[in-house]
């Protein structure tokens, strides 16, 4: 059998083709396919182009596409129609990218427990797979969420620099401000037009500088980390109070590449935070394989 999985996040989209034993047959990475960022037409175009290239030797038996921002409603219907039209004889399913994470958990076959996934990349969201099905808590997008994403880290840092530039007594030579100005190549005020043009992905690209400054002992970077992990911990507490039988949270996203982020969040929750040692696209393939059973 030929099993295809797609993991479409806010920054990149991974495509994986494997057999029923998990043997990798083909893999490729393209850009963002989040329809809220690139538009649904560009999203569908990228997904169909990538899947066609991935499966150039023949149609897959099953496909699961987990798409950030495209898991529900009209967007999900458009994606399903496009993939089904491309491979009309294949079993096709699509949903939010969090499904990929959930299928990276060893507990996915334990029907007595629920599995939660926490995504902290460009954006952030919590998803839960339980006897009630799959549902989301938080993850309303950068206009309405208030912390815990790469966008939030970058925005918090840039907002602090903008504020400091307007205060004559501010020290602009701190590790965090120095790193931000170096990346911007100009003052934050002069960079405002380019920040708005770059939008959410560009602002999120400043998040790693917070951790770099943190390692240099910058107190503002420490407070940004603390604020954002406080918000995430409170969200996880609400989810646990609602669901009850969750003891493991599968985690993914660029922020988890920073050990300080995982350490800070872990210290604020009694849930076990599990960062899988496989790519989320592997979870997409596992979900696709289940469609054939």
Model-predicted regions and their roles:
Residues 64-71:
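Polybasic, low-complexity association/targeting segments
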């Amino acid at each position: 059998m030929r099993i295809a999985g797609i993991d479409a996040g806010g920054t990149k989209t991974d495509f994986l083709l494997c057999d029923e034993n998990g043997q990798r047959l083909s893999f490729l990475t393209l850009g963002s396919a989040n329809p809220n960022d690139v538009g649904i037409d560009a999203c569908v175009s990228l997904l169909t182009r990538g899947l066609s290239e991935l499966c150039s030797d023949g149609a897959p038996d099953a496909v699961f596409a987990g798409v950030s921002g495209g898991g529900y409603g009209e967007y999900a219907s458009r994606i399903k129609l496009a993939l089904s039209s491309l491979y009309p004889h294949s079993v096709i399913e699509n949903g939010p990218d969090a499904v990929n994470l959930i299928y990276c958990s060893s507990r996915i076959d334990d029907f007595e427990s629920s599995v939660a996934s926490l995504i902290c990349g460009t954006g952030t969201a919590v998803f839960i797979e339980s006897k009630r099905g799959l549902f989301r808590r938080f993850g309303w997008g950068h206009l309405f969420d208030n912390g815990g994403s790469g966008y939030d880290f970058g925005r918090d840092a840039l907002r602090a620099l903008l504020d400091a530039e307007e205060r004559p007594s501010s020290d602009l030579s701190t590790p965090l401000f120095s790193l931000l100005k170096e990346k911007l190549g100009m003052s934050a005020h002069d960079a405002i037009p380019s920040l708005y043009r770059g939008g959410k992905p560009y602002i999120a690209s400043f998040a790693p500088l917070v951790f770099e400054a943190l390692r240099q002992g910058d107190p503002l970077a420490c407070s940004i980390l603390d604020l954002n992990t406080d918000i995430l911990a409170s969200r996880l507490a609400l989810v646990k109070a609602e669901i009850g039988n969750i003891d493991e949270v599968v985690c993914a996203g660029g922020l988890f590449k920073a050990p300080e982020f995982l350490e800070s969040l872990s210290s604020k929750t009694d849930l076990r935070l599990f960062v899988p040692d496989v790519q989320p696209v592997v979870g997409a393939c596992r979900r696709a394989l289940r469609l054939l059973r």
